């Protein structure tokens, strides 16, 4: 199996972060908008495309905050993700010229049911993946430096 690159957006407005709300057999779970890099596009081009699909908004990409690996065989969904090895690049991003009213995805993933602004202080109450990233976002907002490379975390 090959290693897949993925770009993710950390979009913060005020005290909230924008996440995709998804559903599986265990209920709702939340992910940072973004997805896989396609052949011939840069990681930033992938993020712009994926945000348009999942959030329906143009984003401006800022600082690369974290790089996280996900080696599926090492985590809770190992039986389903045994062949998955993904490198994810998390960028601070912002919505450019946000349209008024509801933000709607243009081409959501099959498990995505909507998008939601989640209070950052309540992130621990949500089933957010990767779980470990929640604490790093809170540290970032407090001005606390964290490593860029986080390793194989979930």
Please provide the spans of the model-predicted regions.
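Nudix hydrolase/Nudix homology domain
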Residues: 28-30, 101-154
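A short local loop/turn or secondary-structure capping micro-motif enriched for an aromatic residue
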Residues: 26-29, 76
